[in-house]
Amino acid sequence: MNKESSPGRKVFSPSRTVWRSQMSKGTYAPHRVSRITCIINELLSDKVSGFLNELGVIAYIENGRCVREMTKPRPFNLPGDIVSLSNTPVDIFRFTVPRENTKAVINSIIDVAELHIPGRGTIFSQDLMEFSREQPSVNLDFLAQSRSHDYNDILLHKLSCVVFVLSESGSGEYLAKAALDLGICVPLVTFGSGNYMRDQLGLIRITISPEKEIVHLVMPEQDSESIIRILIEHARLDLPGRGFIYQTPVSMGLPDTWLKIGKQKYAATIEQIIAAIDQMKAGTGWRKRLDAEHQEKRIIKSLFPQDNCEISIISDEDRIDRLREACLQVGATGAVSARVIPLAGKDKEGISSTMIRSAINVPADITDKVVDMLLEISTIKDDPTDRIHVLDSPAAYVHKLK
């Protein structure tokens, strides 16, 4: 039995509150689903795309890059090494499946892309509420025929996905290097646009670009608060207009552990050793190195652990601005948008070639109000690719203007 997957005490969940509220109203029926995120080397994208087409799901693809540390020996046999950052182009696949099929789909993708080998990619799932025209489903016959291995021994639980939305050009690579130095994970860097904080800064807004660099880190849940505090200091997110952070829970996943590229000095790589200990210890609890109680407390007032929500909207470019502005008008604390390409199955028709995914951080007390407004003005009942996702976000940080 996986020790880290055993249920703990129940905590307040804004997404469950939204589900109960919308079910009682009876206008829209939210679907309890798992969103699977697969971050894959672009050379392997065709394999994953082919599998998802056969599976019959609608996936949304975003481009990004993974950052690793590369170590090379100095020329002319000089002592020491040359250390630099290496960027690898990746494709990010996001799609939803019924929760009961999550593990089987993850096992199959690990098989197809050989994600059990470090350096090939990361996959994880998050339980959330989805509003869409059709309830997500998968081709069960195809899934049964895939006959994948059971990777329960290496799948990790009690993880967190922490998203850093940064306003300064080049700050994404700087933060990625800090994450690599801490040995957290392989950072994923993507690009988007956002103007929430910029619109509130008056004349100083001309110095802040609407273009954002977004750093995604998948890490053990027990270290997430301490790591967030350290990285806030590194990126100086306690200054106005520098960006915002939010954290979301991960139900299960297999993070890439190949943080450093270089000559192998021992019989096993550090990635293989970490994977073996994770398997023996049935989780990542043994990795805990940081004690939150002894971290600097001066930013505690701005780190909000009071149950926020991430609301993700996927829609056509012509409609997304109206939907996003509706969220910001009622009190959302941050928004960032990126272009995605929908990947639909063979029987899907009338699919737009490009769409926009906008992720918005919303305080728990207004989540239901925001969802009501989005459902009122959205085209979910008409467009099969439009989505609204409501996901718990137990902690967020944004600089508050006085």
Task: Identify the function of each model-found stretch.
Residues N2-K402:
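Positively charged, small/polar-rich N-terminal and surface patches that mediate targeting and assembly
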